[in-house]
Amino acid sequence: MRIQSLLLLGALLAVGSQLPAVFGRKKGEKWGGCPADDGPCLLSVPDQCVEDSQCPLTRKCCYRACFRQCIPRVSVKPGSCPQDQLRCLSPMNHLCHKDSDCSGKKRCCHSACGRDCRDPARG
């Protein structure tokens, strides 16, 4: 009985170590995403972090105003944004800033003229 328990524990640990790869996350990468960064680069500031594991629990290491820093993560909906083949002739206009600004399964995606809510790409 004891050997079976150890084998089961070993198998669970082996499978658990592969979960980040299965779900597309790197080891040490936290759930969630980084908020959009629309800020201009005003200063050359050294990065405050290199990876998520250097940040407190609810924060991710994200680019913000031209350098990496620990900021609150945002929820990310499943699926990827469709490619936009258009060119914008008007000024950028953002209709959303993060996925939670969009209804249902729609994601906040970059388009030619800014960000807007779109259905995720199929595939």
From Swiss-Prot:
Keyword Metal-binding annotated: no
Biological processes per GO annotation: antibacterial humoral response; innate immune response
Any Pfam family hit: WAP
The keyword Membrane appears for this protein: no
Domain of life: Eukaryota
Entry's Gene Ontology cellular component terms: extracellular space
GO molecular function, one term: serine-type endopeptidase inhibitor activity
Leader sequence residues: 1-24
Localization per record: Secreted
Disulfide bonding pattern of the chain: 34-62, 41-66, 49-61, 55-70, 81-109, 88-113, 96-108, 102-117
Protein keywords: Disulfide bond, Protease inhibitor, Repeat, Secreted, Serine protease inhibitor, Signal
Positions of the WAP domain: 27-73, 74-121
Function description: Putative acid-stable proteinase inhibitor.
Entry protein name: WAP four-disulfide core domain protein 5
